[in-house]
């Protein structure tokens, strides 16, 4: 994997800097590095593809070295270099696609394609020029079963979940109380509602709770907490739990009271915040508990009082909500990130070449299914293919 990264970094630099008119002295170190790459690769044969519709391709390396010059690089020099660069880039692209198409239930973090396994040989170690990539560093740590630390912005840590729980119900569905939520990606939105606006609740206050269990622990998370859940702020028709009927939800938004958010690790509270909105920090957690209240307004204007009558029918439904959004966090496991294209790149390659469903990844790389059942085998394979995708992205956009 380190060799693949070093090859890609060298080729990217060569493509960007070996251009007509450039002083040789400005790129002499790069050209020496480029020549070292050619010397190491010459005389070797590789094969890629042969899975799904990814075609089998054979690669032979037998290139001359780039020479020295006292002057600027001329058109012939650059054209010769470009021919070599384009062949190498095509090779790297196919090695990456071959690797992204493969998976293994055992030691899935290790190279799976024939070409990348060959590049892991001792003879290619001299190509290791630059291993500064975060993904390469963490791939090395994971390969040795040591602690990794990926920094994610907008991490897709929450599997998609959209549902409701009714704490008070009846066949007519005309006086309901409960919670509804939407968890997805890096965001939780939860709403508590009471058709009667807590008229019969103790002290006219309804208590709500929403707990979300993470599939992997996060650390040093920057989080935004807002006293609103905009996705539940408009009328809608909702299917009943048994699917036998539908019920009408017509929210009128109130501000939540006594809001508390707890971040837990292995059942122990690590951080807790009360009545604090905006940016908050969570040190280390694998579960989130949101607690909040709906309080019937003690004083109401006639217009508000008309919204919340003392008895049925209840045409408007008192609702309070919260939004919790993870802006950035560190995770020991690799995750999809809304700010990165790695999952999209891997999925696109596997779809384009009709890669058959293997023993590890779900059909279509369905992220909700993948993260819901995030096994060590999936974690290993995902770290490998994401690392390869990050390498490929240096050369192929």
From Swiss-Prot:
Post-translational modification: The N-terminus is blocked.
Gene Ontology CC annotation, any one: viral intermediate capsid
Keyword Zinc appears in the UniProt entry: yes
InterPro entries, A to Z: Capsid_hemagglutn (IPR008980), Rotavirus_A/C_VP6 (IPR001385), Virus_capsid_a-hlx_vir (IPR008935)
GO molecular function: host cell surface receptor binding; metal ion binding; structural molecule activity
Amino acids binding Ca(2+): 266, 286
Pfam families found in the cross-reference section: Rota_Capsid_VP6 (PF00980)
Keywords: Calcium, Capsid protein, Intermediate capsid protein, Metal-binding, Ubl conjugation, Virion, Zinc
Disulfide bonds: none
Compartment(s) of residence: Virion
Record flagged with keyword Metal-binding: yes
Family: Belongs to the rotavirus VP6 family.
Assembly and oligomerization: Homotrimer. Interacts with the inner capsid protein VP2. Interacts with the outer capsid glycoprotein VP7. Interacts with the outer capsid protein VP5*.
Other facts: The VP6 trimer contains a zinc ion located at the center of the molecule. The zinc ion is not essential for either trimerization or transcription activity of the DLP. Zinc-depleted VP6 has an increased sensitivity to proteases.
Protein name (database record): Intermediate capsid protein VP6
Organism expressing this protein natively: Rotavirus A (strain RVA/Human/United States/Wa/1974/G1P1A[8])
Lineage summary: Viruses, Riboviria, Orthornavirae, Duplornaviricota, Resentoviricetes
